[in-house]
Amino acid sequence: MIAPPVVSGIALERAVEAMRGMAYEHRLHILVMLRAGEATPSELAATLEVHPTVVAHHLRHLVDAHLVRRRRSGKRVLYSLPDEATARLIGDVLRYAGV
């Protein structure tokens, strides 16, 4: 029998935080949309057909979970995926779900 690899508690905590971040339909949908590129909260709200405050709430959680990056461009606030690893993770989740 092969011994499982040892994973640090910090790494496990980060993995749990990421999974919690995706555990809501709106959050996962936001992540899927951001795979296509940057978007404003208003653009995301229009696509989701929800009030912008709903999107703002979910974006806060996604930023806290390090699944989404926020940046300012003039008066606009843009959100995007932080890296290619996050985009692959979203793709893997969708494939697991049979999408």
Residue ranges and their predicted role:
Residues 91-95:
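Alpha-helical "hinge/linker" immediately C-terminal to small N-terminal DNA-binding modules
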Residues 88:
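Internal catalytic or translocation cores that form aromatic/hydrophobic pockets or channels
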Residues 1-10:
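Short, intrinsically disordered or compositionally biased N-terminal tails of bacterial proteins
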Residues 58:
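Residues within the DNA-recognition helix of helix-turn-helix
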Residues 46, 63-64:
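Alpha-helical residues within the helix-turn-helix
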Residues 9, 13-53, 73, 77-85:
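N-terminal helix-turn-helix DNA-binding core of bacterial DNA-binding proteins
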Residues 83, 98-99:
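Histidine- and aromatic-rich ligand-binding microenvironments
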